[in-house]
Amino acid sequence: MKLDRQILKLAHHEAHHHLMSDLNYTMELHRFMKDVIDLDTYLSSDFGFKKFLNDYGVGRTLKAGDDPKLKILSLIKDFQFGKSHVQEIAILATKIQQQGLSSQSGKGGPGLPQSFCSKFLYVLKPDQLIPYDSYVLKSLQLTYGLPLKTLDEYYEKADHFRLRYFSEKSDEVIKIREKK
């Protein structure tokens, strides 16, 4: 029982740390999107674009240097966001790739930066989107015993998993609440 409390306390601390960090990235991004801060400021601020790329581990998917990053931020600022986040990820990733702003893939051409786009859109709309992540992808493939080849498949299985294990009425959430 004592170990459960220690684990829960550590998990709470980690969750709080990451949520506060995510919240700071979200606030800074919204300040940029609303023209409260300019492009250069957002690029280099404490919770700005360069730090986001590093902390979220997606900087390697984009072309090196400030110029491509500034072009990506301009592209994002002009991007028309709709209601289908999965489609937005694919469309934005394709635009970045087509403009030659992503890094080279293992196949020799510019890569498709889906992970970057999903994490960026997550920071923009944290209440509406979960990020596309290779570790989550592998976990979902193990959980469901099948390869997930498209963003649609990934998000369908991720949402199913979320609703199964983390909905307010799931058995797991009820068990956790009963232990308090």
Where are these regions (language model features)?
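An N-terminal alpha-helical hairpin/helix-loop-helix interaction module that forms a charged
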Residues: 1-108, 126-180
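Cytochrome P450 catalytic-core helices
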Residues: 117-120
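Terminal substrate-recognition subdomain of acyl/acetyltransferases
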Residues: 123
